[in-house]
Amino acid sequence: MQVYSLQELAQQIGATIRGNADVVVESIAPLDKATEKQLTFISNPKFRSLLAQSHAGILVVSEADVAFCAEQSNLLIVKDPYVAYAVLAQYMDSTPKAASGIAASAVVSASAVIGKNVSIGANAVIEDGVTLGDHVVIGANCFVGKNSKIGAYTQLWANVSVYHEVEIGQHCLIQSGAVIGSDGFGYANDRGRWIKIPQVGQVIIGNHVEIGACTCIDRGALDPTVIEDNVIIDNLCQIAHNVHIGTGTAVAGGVIMAGSLTVGRYCLIGGASVINGHMEICDKVTITGMGMVMRPITEPGVYSSGIPLQTNKEWRKTAALTLGIDAMNKRLKALEKKFEKK
């Protein structure tokens, strides 16, 4: 079991030390469960009451938290404990690492360009013209279609499908079951008969992008679908053809984006939101969970829609009132006209 000293961890995050610099921990745990062999952190002041009784070997805290800690606690004091936790979690990450090399059962085209220290798992298929950068990891049963490019240090977990002509940048992480570059939902209707429109655009994904499990990103009809740098997309999202998502935007689970939508930079899209296509959302917009966006958003800010959870009895009353709004409006207008005549 690898161990990490207070001094070593402090160097990773530029922390101020209080306590025994030689104390060591093995892993990270929640504040209320951490043992003397574990590190923990606090990022919300409402949990300060737990600090004095914590058994953690190391506590990551802000300057404002120090007074609430036991005198004997070993502290890493930082400006932002949550960011420090994220950095340390990466440093101490125990997720299994794939060994470089190509599994015997993998099928790799002779025309594929394979970088240094690449790992290709069992039963993976790498088609003609594919380029894999250095240190790329392709998990078991993955498919990478013709002429696609995957940048250095990008990892595809098992069972990811990357269609043809897709470009994925460096340091990306794509979780199992994701599909990148499938056909967009493009059809023409000829007197009741649907005629499929071939989707010949690409998907272009920037650097440091993460895509969750079972998320689907469709290829463009003509122009590409684009995901810019540092975008994070959660599980079970649908990104339709020709969507363009700006740098630094975060998309929570279950979001549906219709075709030709442009989402600005540094937006936060809450879970299960549904967003209409052929329109734009400006930079720095937050859409709360289950938002239904039918019109463009031109001003930064927080936007919500829908009715928050109520008891069934309350909801039925609300629904009944909503259905009666038109009739009430007509009665109000009639009363206004009546009083105007007087």
From Swiss-Prot:
Gene3D superfamilies the UniProt entry points to: 1.20.5.170, Hexapeptide repeat proteins (2.160.10.10), MurE/MurF, N-terminal domain (3.40.1390.10)
A GO molecular-function annotation: N-acyltransferase activity
Catalytically driven reaction(s): a UDP-3-O-[(3R)-3-hydroxyacyl]-alpha-D-glucosamine + a (3R)-hydroxyacyl-[ACP] = a UDP-2-N,3-O-bis[(3R)-3-hydroxyacyl]-alpha-D-glucosamine + holo-[ACP] + H(+)
Pathway: Bacterial outer membrane biogenesis; LPS lipid A biosynthesis
EC nos: 2.3.1.191
Keyword Protein transport: no
GO terms of biological process kind: lipid A biosynthetic process
Enzyme class: transferase
Entries under Pfam families matching the protein: Hexapep, LpxD
Role, per record: Catalyzes the N-acylation of UDP-3-O-acylglucosamine using 3-hydroxyacyl-ACP as the acyl donor. Is involved in the biosynthesis of lipid A, a phosphorylated glycolipid that anchors the lipopolysaccharide to the outer membrane of the cell.
Protein name according to UniProt: UDP-3-O-acylglucosamine N-acyltransferase
Organism in which the protein naturally occurs: Pasteurella multocida (strain Pm70)
Organism classification: Bacteria, Pseudomonadati, Pseudomonadota, Gammaproteobacteria, Pasteurellales
